[in-house]
Design a protein with these regions (language model features):
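Surface-exposed, secretory/extracytoplasmic low-complexity segments enriched in Ser/Thr/Asn/Gly/Pro
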Residues: 1-230
């Protein structure tokens, strides 16, 4: 006849929970939050940056493992092997992260070169990468406000409407005039729409800005080489 006996372990669960909660590894200042894998710009494109497990304890599972170890007379716990740490939501294998990278890289295909006379301004991946973001749920967003600010910077730099102009009079003296209705004016609304469309469509183009009013030249005096002194 075979007799099977089980060895039981009894303990006060409340006291055990108190002991577990008092462990150094359970203290908030000893725990580091896990970091999700995420898209990261490497200077050429967005690639998947590996996340980190950190040291944040999965409290429920940790207590379960401790109790099982006591009941099994185990003196040590491999916390990594026993999945006692909170894992990142996204890893390098997560399809959501891969898709986010692909979506962000679509914007980086664009390259827009503006001609302003002998000057050029370029909107390419290095700049566009600053206008594309991804949130904690791997949703990609293009920052349209950044396009608005960029076009406004172009206006500040290249618009000449109602600016002061200095020229040499017929008598050889220097004179300055201001006001009037002459000069370059970038059509802000049209240019914002055009630039954003270029970027969203991943286009490579060389072009002039959209203007609501033009002048003779971007280089030097915007009236060119001819004027009438009144």
């Amino acid at each position: 006849q075979t007799i099977t006996a089980s060895v039981g372990v009894t303990y006060d669960e409340n006291q055990l929970d108190t002991l577990i909660n008092g462990l150094e590894c359970m203290q908030a200042d000893q725990q580091v939050e896990p970091v999700n894998a995420h898209p990261e710009y490497d200077g050429n494109s967005y690639v998947v940056k590996a996340g980190e497990t950190g040291s944040k304890i999965d409290t429920e599972n940790f207590k379960k493992v401790v109790k099982e170890s006591i009941e099994g007379f185990k003196s040590e716990i491999d916390m990594t092997a026993e999945d006692c740490y909170v894992e990142p939501k996204y890893t390098i294998e997560s399809e959501e992260v891969k898709k986010a990278c692909d979506d962000m890289n679509k914007y980086l295909k664009a390259s827009i070169t503006y001609n302003f006379g002998s000057n050029t301004e370029v909107v390419d991946k290095d700049l566009i990468s600053q206008w594309v973001t991804v949130d904690d749920n791997m949703a990609v967003t293009f920052n349209s406000d950044a396009v608005v600010k960029y076009v406004q910077q172009l206006e500040s730099k290249y618009d000449t409407y109602q600016t002061k102009r200095t020229f040499t009079t017929g008598g050889g003296n220097s004179a300055t005039v201001e006001g009037g209705d002459y000069g370059w004016i970038i059509d802000e609304a049209a240019e914002i729409a055009a630039l954003e469309a270029n970027i969203r469509n991943g286009e490579t183009v060389t072009r002039e800005a959209n203007y609501s009013q033009t002048a003779a030249s971007h280089d030097g005096a915007d009236w060119g080489n001819t004027y009438v002194e009144v």
